[in-house]
Amino acid sequence: EFGENPNDVNAYAASTFYAVDRFASYQRVWKNDYASGGLILSDRYTTSNAVHQGGKLEGKAREEFFSWLYDLEFNRMGLPKPDLVLWLDMPVEIAESLMRKRESDTGTKADIHERDDGYLHKCREVAQQAADYFGWTRVSCVRDGRLRSIEDIHEELYAHVQSCLEEI
């Protein structure tokens, strides 16, 4: 409806659509749980906008976008700021290898973004910048050039969550 590829919609417009969707979800689904002290876990939350939409911009324009996005979602819309963001960092080459294995194991095909090597590299670059800008906690999924075990990554994630819960 808005174009043939993701770049047909500018980062600010696309981010606004997703932010409004998050706002509606917050108001309808999890606001009361959050207000009563419930623990809310989210996969991608505002971080997805920072990475995918931030990738449409370069240099200073990207940092200005990060600032705008933070203001839009947390100040103007009043969405709760996360106490902790865990970014699972993985080199693109290893991610691509895992996607090929998944395709082979399940008989499925990678989506249009997963097949775009340039897009994957751009997303990782933007995620690294966003992690620095927003203060995300980086969890490397690779050690000494090899994929860490699920259990090893889990233990690190659990330790970060446990530490955060002790602080709040």
Question: Each PLM stretch: what is its role?
Answer:
Residues E93-I168:
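NTP-dependent small-molecule kinase module
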